[in-house]
Every structure is written in C-alpha cells, then in structure tokens.
Amino acid sequence: MQRRTFLAASLAAVAGSAVLGWRWWSQERQPVLLSARDNAQGEHFAVGYTLAGEQLFATQVTARCHDICVHPSLPLALFTGRRPSTESYLIDLQTGRLLQTLVTPANRHFQGHAVFDARGERLYSTENDTDEPGRGVIGVWQLDTAQRLQRVDDLSSHGVGPHQLLWLPDGKTLVVANGGIRTESGSREALNLDAMEPS
C-alpha cells in the first residue's frame, strides 16, 4: 500500500468519529480536529487544530474535559466535563469563543458524555444525582435561537453511574451505558466496587 493511499484511508476512518481523544469537525471549510488538553501548570483547554497541526484555538476552561459532542449542523461543540465535574463548555468552532458554561443543578454532576439529537435541538447529558447517590440521570437541554442551552427536563438512566450514551441508527432510540460505579461529587473515588451493577 502506498503512503498516500494509507493516509487517505486513515483520514476517512477518522472522519466523524473519536480517535484517541480527538473529534473531527468539517463544514464547508477546512477540517478541524478537536480535543481537550492540560498544560504543565494544570490549566485546562478546549482546543482545535488543522490537519497540518496548526492550532486554531485553545480556549481556557475551568474543569478538565472528557468528551466532545459536536452539533450536527451548527459550528458548535460541547466539551463535556470529566466525572465528577459540574461544568461543561459550549464552544464556537469557528472562533474558539466560549459561548456558554453549562452548570448542572446543585444536586448533580456530569459523567463525561453528551449527545445532540439528529436535528440539534436538544442535548442529552449523562449525570449523577448526589441527593440519591448512584441514581443515574440524563439531563435534557434545549438549544435556543441565541445558541444557548437551557435545562428543560431530567430522565432516569435506569441504572447507576451512566457514562456513554449514543443514538441507535433509527435516530429515536437513545442507548445509555450505565457503568454501575457510584461516585460522589467531591472526588472520583468509587464507592461500591464490591456491589457494582453495570447495565
């Protein structure tokens, strides 16, 4: 296989998916690789790079991020806070500007993942309820015309410690991976390893 063929095939495999902590975004312009990073001082950043490795933006955020949820049609992405963060960050992918810091309700923390629906009108985030430790919650957020997310509902994840969530190909069925691990908002310490029940 020639180098050019290999690179083209590799690039095709990367398109639209997460590879080694990166996300891909392209919309009638040069593709952008998205990720989150920390510097030597422990500061956290949402970052975008060209395929040639040129940094387009490095937006400082308060909390370490885990996953990136890209809007299906707008140049927006939510950099989701790593468990047990109470913040996630909505970033303009054309400028790198922080548009909004999403904050969970007082009795919740993010579990690291979120997805937009196919039309990009609603966002679903995995969360933990700290009032009822271990109760998994899916936060529902509505994207308004000003491109801000507003909390509109809570759904049960039907398990403990929801982590990843994805749409099935029908676009109507949301699948949630409950890790079964109970943690509290103050640390990442697992509190129930002897009795965890993933689902």
Regions found by a protein language model. Give the residues of each.
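Repeated scaffold domains used in trafficking and secretory/extracellular systems
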Residues: A63-C69, H109-H113, V160-L165
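A short beta-strand motif characteristic of beta-propeller blades
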Residues: E54-T59, R97-T104, Q150-L155
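Beta-propeller blade signature
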Residues: V137-L143, A195-S199
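Short, conserved, GDST-rich strand-edge loop motifs in beta-rich repeat architectures
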Residues: T126-P133, A177-E197
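Short loop/turn segments that connect beta-strands within beta-propeller blades
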Residues: T50-A52, L93-T95, L143-A146
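Residue-level detector of Asp-centered blade-edge/turn motifs that repeat once per structural unit
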Residues: P72-S73, A118-R119, P169-D170
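N-terminal export signals
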Residues: M1-W25
